[in-house]
C-alpha cells in the first residue's frame, strides 16, 4: 500500500477528501488576514537587522524581517476588527515614503489545526496540518516535528493504527500547547485602546489551560515543571522571555526571606551587560556576516 504525505498549502487536498475536520481557533486567535510587501534597501550597505521586528498595531501586528537585499514586511490583522483598505493603509504608513508605490499581496487564513493528522496511510504535514499565524514561526517548527515523528513511527511492519494513534495524540497536545503560547503574546498586553486588544485580554478568549498557568506565575516564574520536554516546542525560557518582556509582574514578596543571593544576581546581570557591550563593539555587523557567509561558503554554498 502506498503512503501519502499531504503538505499542500492552499487546497489541503487530502484531508477534506477524507473528511478530516478542521478545528478553528478563531475564538482565541483573531488574526485571519495578512498583507505582505518586499522593500529593497535604499543603499547596498544599509544595516541588516539581526532579528525580526514585531510591532503591535490597532488590529494586529507588523513583521519586519531583514534579508540580504531587501526587507520582508507584512501586516497580520483581524477582519473582525479592521478591513483590507484600513489594514493596507497601516502597512504603507509603516513603510513610509517607500511604501507609496510598493506592491503588496493580500492573504486569507484561519488559525486552527486538524485533530487527526495521520489517517490510514496518509499524514498531513505543515500547513495542511494546521497553522496559527506567522508569530514565532510555529509552522516551521511543526513541519520539522512532524517529519521527525514520521521517521520514528513509520509503520514498516504495517502497524498503521498504533502509529497513527500515537502521532495524532502527540500532535494534538503540541497544537494545544503552542496555541497557549501564541495567545500569551496578546492576553497579557496592557493595551486597551482598541476593540482588538480589549477582546484579546478578555478571559473569555483565553484557554483555561493558559489561565491556569498565569495563575501559577503570579507568584513564581515559569520553570521546567510547567513544560513537557516531549511535547512543548517552546521551553520555559521562551515563556519567560514573553512574560517578562511584556512587563508581567511575578510577586515574590512572600519568599523574600529566602532570596539571599540578590547581590550575586546583580553582579551576574552586570557582567552579562558588560559582555553584551563588548560583543557589540567587537563582532561584525549582521551585513558583514551575511556577506562573509555568501563569499566563503559559510554554512552553505558559496555565491556564484
What is each of the regions a protein language model found here?
Residues 19, 23, 48, 75, ...:
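Generic preference for well-ordered secondary structure
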Residues 19-21, 126, 130, 277, ...:
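Glycine-centered secondary-structure boundary/capping sites
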Residues 72, 139, 257-259:
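Generic secondary-structure boundary signal with a strong preference for alpha-helix termini
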Residues 68, 77-189:
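FAD/FMN-dependent oxidoreductases across multiple families
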Residues 152-304:
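Long, low-complexity C-terminal extensions of enzymes
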Residues 14, 61-63, 109, 118, ...:
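Tryptophan-centered motif/residue detector
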Residues 1-98, 147:
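Predominantly flavin-linked oxidoreductase catalytic cores and closely associated redox partners
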Amino acid at each position: 500500500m502506498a503512503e501519502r504525505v499531504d503538505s499542500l498549502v492552499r487546497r489541503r487536498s487530502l484531508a477534506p477528501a477524507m473528511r478530516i475536520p478542521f478545528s478553528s481557533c478563531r475564538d482565541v486567535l483573531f488574526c485571519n488576514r495578512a498583507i505582505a510587501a518586499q522593500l529593497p534597501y535604499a543603499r547596498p550597505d544599509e544595516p541588516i537587522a539581526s532579528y525580526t521586528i514585531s510591532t503591535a498595531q490597532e488590529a494586529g501586528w507588523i513583521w519586519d524581517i531583514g534579508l540580504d537585499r531587501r526587507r520582508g514586511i507584512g501586516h497580520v490583522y483581524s477582519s473582525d476588527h479592521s478591513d483590507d483598505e484600513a489594514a493596507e493603509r497601516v502597512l504603507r504608513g509603516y513603510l513610509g515614503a517607500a511604501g507609496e508605490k510598493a506592491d503588496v499581496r493580500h492573504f486569507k487564513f484561519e488559525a486552527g489545526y486538524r485533530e487527526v493528522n495521520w489517517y490510514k496511510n496518509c499524514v498531513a504535514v505543515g500547513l495542511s496540518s494546521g497553522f496559527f499565524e506567522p508569530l514565532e514561526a510555529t509552522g516551521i517548527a511543526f513541519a520539522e516535528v512532524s517529519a521527525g515523528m514520521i521517521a520514528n513511527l513509520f509503520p514498516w511492519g504495517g502497524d498503521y493504527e498504533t502509529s497513527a494513534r500515537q502521532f495524532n495524540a502527540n500532535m494534538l497536545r503540541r497544537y494545544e500547547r503552542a496555541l497557549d503560547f501564541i495567545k500569551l503574546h496578546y492576553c497579557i498586553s496592557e493595551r486597551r485602546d482598541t476593540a482588538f486588544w480589549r477582546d484579546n485580554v478578555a478571559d473569555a478568549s483565553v484557554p483555561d489551560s493558559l489561565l491556569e498557568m498565569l495563575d501559577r506565575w503570579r507568584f513564581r516564574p515559569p520553570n521546567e515543571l510547567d513544560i513537557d520536554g516531549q511535547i512543548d516546542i517552546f521551553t520555559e525560557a521562551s515563556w519567560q522571555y514573553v512574560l517578562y518582556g511584556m512587563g508581567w509582574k511575578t510577586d515574590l514578596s512572600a519568599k523574600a526571606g529566602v532570596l539571599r543571593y540578590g547581590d550575586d544576581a546583580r553582579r551576574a546581570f552586570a557582567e552579562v551587560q558588560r559582555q553584551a557591550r563588548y560583543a557589540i563593539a567587537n563582532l561584525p555587523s549582521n551585513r558583514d556576516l551575511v556577506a562573509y557567509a555568501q563569499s566563503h561558503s559559510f554554512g552553505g554554498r558559496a555565491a556564484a
